[in-house]
Amino acid sequence: MRHYEIILLIHPDQSEQVPAMLERYKGMITAGGGKIHRVEDWGRRQLAYMINKLAKAHYLCVNIEADQAVMAELEHAFKFNDAVLRHLTVVKKKAETGASSMMKTVEREEARKASQAEFAAANER
């Protein structure tokens, strides 16, 4: 089995359905004998260019270990799901379990927003 990193761009109006979509894809992977090493929800982010007249998309990153049959099934599911704007699958040499640089950026942004909210609340008193 090979290691893969999958990046999904989901339609921003479908952000509420992302957990259900993710569970369906996880089920496909584990049913085929694959393993999930890392799942990251990067949230709604600005796109570099417009896709289907949309400026934002919901990003997901999944690192898995699976065989070719499972990957073909996943690619087929991505292709025929209208909520998936784009998908990218990259073969990796080894499993990656640590936080990605993008996830670290997302966590930093969330921490900055939280500290700004605390600062604003403290200054109102």
Swiss-Prot record:
PROSITE patterns: RIBOSOMAL_S6. The keyword Cytoplasm does not apply. The keyword Ribosomal protein applies. One of its GO terms (molecular function) is structural constituent of ribosome. Residues 105-115 have a biased composition (Basic and acidic residues). GO terms for cellular component: cytosolic small ribosomal subunit. Residues 96-125 are annotated as: Disordered. GO terms for biological process: translation. Coiled coil: none annotated. Binds together with bS18 to 16S ribosomal RNA. Belongs to the bacterial ribosomal protein bS6 family. This is Small ribosomal subunit protein bS6. It comes from Paracidovorax citrulli (strain AAC00-1). The gene is rpsF.
